[in-house]
């Protein structure tokens, strides 16, 4: 299968993107819960 992303598999891009999104959301909620969200 040949996709438009080149040598990088689409599922790998989706997985990395998902992990980054979950990580950012987790950091955001953790920061706001611990009182650091207002400074960010």
Curated annotation (Swiss-Prot):
Residue stretches spanning the membrane: 8-28
Function: One of the components of the core complex of photosystem II (PSII). PSII is a light-driven water:plastoquinone oxidoreductase that uses light energy to abstract electrons from H(2)O, generating O(2) and a proton gradient subsequently used for ATP formation. It consists of a core antenna complex that captures photons, and an electron transfer chain that converts photonic excitation into a charge separation.
Stated name of the protein: Photosystem II reaction center protein J
GO cellular component labels: chloroplast thylakoid membrane; photosystem II reaction center
Gene assigned in the entry: psbJ
Keywords attached to this entry: Chloroplast, Membrane, Photosynthesis, Photosystem II, Plastid, Reaction center, Thylakoid, Transmembrane, Transmembrane helix
Family: Belongs to the PsbJ family.
InterPro entries registered for this protein in UniProt: PSII_PsbJ (IPR002682), PSII_PsbJ_sf (IPR037267)
SUPFAM superfamilies, sorted: Photosystem II reaction center protein J, PsbJ (SSF161021)
Membrane topology: Single-pass membrane protein
Subunit-level organization: PSII is composed of 1 copy each of membrane proteins PsbA, PsbB, PsbC, PsbD, PsbE, PsbF, PsbH, PsbI, PsbJ, PsbK, PsbL, PsbM, PsbT, PsbX, PsbY, PsbZ, Psb30/Ycf12, at least 3 peripheral proteins of the oxygen-evolving complex and a large number of cofactors. It forms dimeric complexes.
Localization per record: Plastid, Chloroplast thylakoid membrane
Gene Ontology biological process terms in this record: photosynthesis
């Amino acid at each position: 299968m040949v996709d438009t992303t080149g040598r990088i598999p689409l599922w790998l891009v989706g997985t990395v993107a998902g992990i980054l999104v979950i990580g950012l959301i987790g950091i955001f909620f953790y920061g706001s819960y611990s009182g650091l969200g207002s400074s960010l």
